[in-house]
Amino acid sequence: MSVSGLPFDDFRTLLRDLPGPDARALVAARERDAQLTKPPGALGRLEEIAFWLAAWTGRPPAVNRPLVAIFAGNHGVTRQGITPFPPAVTQQMVENFAAGGAAINQICVTHDLGLKVFDLALDYPTGDITEEAALSERDCAATMAFGMEAIAGGTDLLCIGEMGIGNTTIAAAINYALYGGSARDWVGPGTGSEGDMLERKVAAVEKAVALHSDHLDDPLEIMRRLGGREIAAMAGAILAARMERIPVLIDGYVATAAAAILKAANPSALDHCLIGHVSAEPGHLRSIEMLGKTPLLALGMRLGEGTGAALAAGIVKAAAACHSGMATFAQAGVSGKH
């Protein structure tokens, strides 16, 4: 998958011509499911997940090369005093991922998932969205193109996650711009903002959306003005996966905000995606509902870093294993329905 040129027009062209699911593979999966040694529907969402895998991969459900991709970026809006942690923590956590010391490392080992971490110019934070656009169109498009390379090594299930001090503020601004309501509807504690700091966070989101209000009718403009490098890269990765018919699991509040940009640009853009979990960040459930999705897990987590999507990958792998490994009634000599 490659994209020539940097303007948003390249991505608008891709978004207008998205591949759809494979109807024949879906029918074949449903037919096999009907023969397995269980009552119809007894595996609940596991059956739906197996059908989803078949429809998007075009083959019997299987997960052989799952990958977690984490995109890390820094944000100029942290200068507004909206988070208790300094931006240096983003780089420190990238190093922790590399050393195997983060929660995501343990989950990847547990579920046998690959892990890639993408450092997105951490020494050069985006513009402060309360004062200027986060990125130029050229930089935003280039970062989307970079994110598309997440699938270059090959994967058949992509888990999307992020790391970035200040990025729940970014996610709140994107959701506020896309869906309205009030800034307070979308702002939560993130890494621990409370009291006056939480109020500064609300004020920053209000100020940012007001500043850019004349340019918020275009989802890609929302992304470049209010987003960040990890937002753009995640959007690029999700889009690249769609073009290559790779199923995607989306992680938490920030990853869902990146996905929402694509959904706003094309209502079918997330048909190949499932939401891995609903986080404890207050705006996440509402943003998932706006996407018309139902999360696979609800564990009260709010870490980000791809952790919820990675845990959900274990469920997806189980769904594929049940579909492919269970015996049929005929094979097992079990009587079917009268």
UniProtKB/Swiss-Prot annotation:
Pathway as given in its UniProt record: Nucleoside biosynthesis; alpha-ribazole biosynthesis; alpha-ribazole from 5,6-dimethylbenzimidazole: step 1/2
The keyword Transferase is assigned to this record: yes
Catalytic residues identified in the record: E305 (proton acceptor)
SUPFAM superfamilies in the record: Nicotinate mononucleotide:5,6-dimethylbenzimidazole phosphoribosyltransferase (CobT)
Membrane-spanning segments: none
Superkingdom in the source lineage: Bacteria
Keywords on record: Cobalamin biosynthesis, Glycosyltransferase, Transferase
Single GO MF annotation: nicotinate-nucleotide-dimethylbenzimidazole phosphoribosyltransferase activity
Keyword Cytoplasm annotated: no
Catalytic activity: 5,6-dimethylbenzimidazole + nicotinate beta-D-ribonucleotide = alpha-ribazole 5'-phosphate + nicotinate + H(+)
The EC number(s) this enzyme carries: 2.4.2.21
A Gene Ontology BP annotation from the UniProt entry: cobalamin biosynthetic process
Family: Belongs to the CobT family.
NCBIfam families (UniProt xref): cobT_DBIPRT, PRK00105.1
Function of the protein: Catalyzes the synthesis of alpha-ribazole-5'-phosphate from nicotinate mononucleotide (NAMN) and 5,6-dimethylbenzimidazole (DMB).
Protein name: Nicotinate-nucleotide--dimethylbenzimidazole phosphoribosyltransferase
Protein's organism: Rhizobium etli (strain CIAT 652)
